[in-house]
Amino acid sequence: MTTVPISNIRNFSIVAHIDHGKSTLADRLIQMTGGLTDREMAGKEQVLDSMDIERERGITIKAQTVRLAYRAKDGKDYIFNLMDTPGHVDFAYEVSRSLAACEGSLLVVDASQGVEAQTLANVYQALDNNHEIVPVLNKVDLPAAEPEKVKQQIEDVIGIDASDAVMISAKTGLGVPDVLEAIVTRLPPPKGDRDATLKALLVDSWYDVYLGVVVLIRVVDGVMKKGSRVRMMGTGAAYDVERVGFFTPKMTQVDELGPGEIGFITAAIKEVADTRVGDTITDDRKPVTEMLPGFKPAIPVVFCGLFPVDADDFETLRAAMGKLRLNDASFSFEMETSAALGFGFRCGFLGLLHLEIIQERLSREFDLNLIATAPSVIYKMKLTDGTELEIHNPVDMPDVVKIEEIQEPWIEATILTPDEYLGSVLKLCQDRRGAQKELTYVGARAMVKYDLPLNEVVFDFYDRLKSVSKGYASFDYHLTDYKPADLVKMQILVNAEPVDALSMLVHRTRAEGRGRAMVEKMKELIPPHMFQIPIQAAIGGKVIARETVRALRKDVTAKCYGGDITRKRKLLEKQKEGKKKMRQFGKVDIPQEAFIAALKVDS
């Protein structure tokens, strides 16, 4: 492929809410510029969503990149570097790094659904990166499409001019040539100096079985050449570049990448953890002094324990997590043991969707059957002796007497909902200890901003929001700060033994409701044993809820006919003694479904 002047390069990303059609638009752009032939595209949708789970759920998880060659109407040849980014809030870090590598964005909005909460979040990120934004209205061929109304919405909510928005239908290809022209005429070319020292941004990295770690880069200044020796400024490690190339989406090797270009390098790097996203890559012999403004590393927000149902699968689980970790640096895990569930891992995730996807990938790709404990967040604790702790497992919480203050993380949530469901949405947020910040109307929809404790959101807030709004509300959040909270550690005791996998930190006002709901659920699902089993929810030494599973008993008086009552009483007393002894030494088997159901209860 011949080199093109930097003024003819366009680097852009597509930002949109889940399901507004950005991966389908990417398919059309690839097809119309000849990145893949019609035969290669046949029977394949969402070419860039390479994981099965991405296609099946219709979501993009990993940011993908593709280079396209395009001859514009002005007769010049252009190079487009397209970054397909995820739309879901958990993967916002994937979005941030893709946006930093581009100069412009296509904002795709579904003409029948309008602007959604995550569209807003991603657009604001693009504006923070000084992007030029071209609004694109997708699905205009649907009977429910209201392009004029949505244009007005884009102007009202986001504040960018949408009068010349491109009207398309990504599925049929209608209007897609206009998008290609808009990229040429309305998005700016990158800036960069070919003669300066090499400076490149590390956008992403993943593990390839044959090539080792593949690093996705955006060259800012200088030239990235095959055979040169480069240094990662964040870690200080130096490597020899073995391959240089780009994706069309097929891997294509070249000798060098110039300023403004996006491509990949391989350099015998052993682990993805050695390549920090947002790092600056420079020439090892004459390095630059200033690093590029990088990204914040992705910090896990939600934690939960994952345990294999079959204890023999422990090593398989360890290996599987190691493999997933190769490609997902934001996923962390450490070993933990539980008296009830045996050996497992305490894992950190970016959010609930991330947790769900990792769990699903473990069960699907590695055929593992897992139990997940209740998700929890990181709490900060100040002890009476002045030390400060961070705790992400309720089991590790110190004695109440030693704690001076507990702080929990809070988020700012933006919820967009149709007007008729506003009441139910506000009630849900109030029930979750939320504080309303603002309420504005965008056409027939309300946009609410709420401060909420993350602890209340990680359980089932998203599912509840979808059910109270019949699936119409959309939700996005970002962490704000830590605030002091009146939290207590609630334990569930079965036959006077605490079940560590079910202990959790809850707000004092909600402890009783949740405790009662959990013990009632457990009572239904623990089968009767030969002795009675008390199930209790307790805070410290105080029991706040109790249910009892009745004992199975044999009718010991069946063979006594008439006669003296003392004989019957003696047999009943003897049975009672036996049951008492049994209860002392008996072990209660808690079925797996009892755990799962207890963790899902709504108080």
From Swiss-Prot:
Q: Where in the cell is it found?
A: Cell inner membrane
SMART domains for this protein: EFG_C
Q: Which GO terms describe its molecular function?
A: GTP binding; GTPase activity; guanosine tetraphosphate binding; ribosome binding; translation elongation factor activity
Instruction: List, alphabetically, the InterPro entries matched.
Output: EF-4, EFG_III/V, EFG_V-like, EFTu-like_2, G_TR_CS, LepA_C_sf, LepA_CTD, LepA_IV
Query: Which residue ranges run through the membrane?
Result: none
Give me the residues that bind GTP, please. D19, H20, G21, K22, S23, T24, N138, K139, V140, D141
* GO CC entries: plasma membrane
A single GO BP term for this record reads:
positive regulation of translation
Q: Could you tell me the membrane topology recorded for this protein?
A: Peripheral membrane protein
Q: Which residues form the tr-type G domain?
A: 7-191
Catalytic activities:
GTP + H2O = GDP + phosphate + H(+)
- Per the record, the major location class is membrane
Q: Which UniProt keywords apply?
A: Cell inner membrane, Cell membrane, GTP-binding, Hydrolase, Membrane, Nucleotide-binding, Protein biosynthesis
User: Hey, which family's this protein in?
Assistant: Belongs to the TRAFAC class translation factor GTPase superfamily. Classic translation factor GTPase family. LepA subfamily.
- Please explain the role this protein plays, according to its UniProt record: Required for accurate and efficient protein synthesis under certain stress conditions. May act as a fidelity factor of the translation reaction, by catalyzing a one-codon backward translocation of tRNAs on improperly translocated ribosomes. Back-translocation proceeds from a post-translocation (POST) complex to a pre-translocation (PRE) complex, thus giving elongation factor G a second chance to translocate the tRNAs correctly. Binds to ribosomes in a GTP-dependent manner.
Q: Which HAMAP family match?
A: LepA
| Protein's recorded name | Elongation factor 4
Organism (species): Bradyrhizobium diazoefficiens (strain JCM 10833 / BCRC 13528 / IAM 13628 / NBRC 14792 / USDA 110)
What gene name does this entry carry?
lepA
